[in-house]
Swiss-Prot record:
It comes from the Archaea. Belongs to the transaldolase family. Type 3B subfamily. This is Probable transaldolase. PANTHER family: FRUCTOSE-6-PHOSPHATE ALDOLASE 1-RELATED, TRANSALDOLASE. Coiled coil: none annotated. Signal peptide: none annotated. Its EC number is 2.2.1.2.
């Protein structure tokens, strides 16, 4: 399973990319606004760091506006993927863009119906939001299992990106269910490195080594 980093923070992207953990990046207008920088400049810099796909979201809500924005976004770098909202207008745009060879990531997916429709329209990726479903009293991971099964049944090439990841368990469940990608906030990815028994083991090794050095 691929790890995408869900952030527009260039320093964090560099940090985790140096560890070999970043297969791609997803951004949205909120994440970029937090950086206080020009939208296009941020996307270009991220694309220069990461070899994999970098999702950049359109702002327009009408198909014509989305298509126009998408054509401009893909001029920024070869690895830009255009993020499109799951609406009728969004899928209309996806249908046009896919025929032009422009990769798309349909976001704000909350049902298998939506994922299937996005795939039919030609989406490269679909992004179901598991954390937000959990917040709404549903089990977000059930949706991932459902989408993966449907796509497997029919050999659908659209990749499933598990989004709105809240904790490391979401990541492991995504891998168990066969999702193609989990897009992970850096705070969650950072937690995945740690386990108390690892810390305890290192502490024990160091004590043993110090004791050995004393007795030499």
């Amino acid at each position: 399973m691929k790890f995408f980093l869900d952030t527009a923070n260039v320093d964090k992207i560099k940090e985790f990319n140096d560890l070999g953990m970043v297969d791609g990046v997803t951004t949205n207008p909120t994440l970029i606004a937090k950086e206080g920088r020009d939208f296009h400049e941020v996307i270009k810099e991220i694309c220069s760091i990461v070899d994999g796909p970098v999702s950049a979201e359109v702002i327009a809500l009408d198909a014509e506006g989305m298509i126009e924005e998408a054509r401009e976004l893909v001029k920024l770098a070869d690895n830009v993927v255009v993020k499109i909202p799951m609406t009728k207008e969004g899928l209309k745009a996806v249908n046009v863009l896919s025929k032009e060879g422009i990769q798309t990531n349909v976001t704000l997916i909350f049902s298998a119906n939506q994922a299937l429709m996005a795939a039919k329209a030609g989406a490269t990726y679909v992004s179901p939001f598991v954390g937000r479903l959990d917040d709404n009293g549903q089990n977000g991971m059930d949706l991932i299992a459902e989408i993966v099964q449907i796509f497997t049944n029919y050999g659908i090439a659209t990749e499933v990106i598990v989004a709105s990841v809240r904790h490391p368990i979401h990541v492991i469940q995504s891998a168990e269910m066969g999702a193609d990608v989990a897009t992970i906030p850096f705070a969650v990815l950072d937690k995945m490195f740690n386990h108390p028994l690892t810390d305890k083991g290192i502490e024990s090794f160091m004590k043993d080594w110090e004791e050995f050095q004393k007795n030499k």
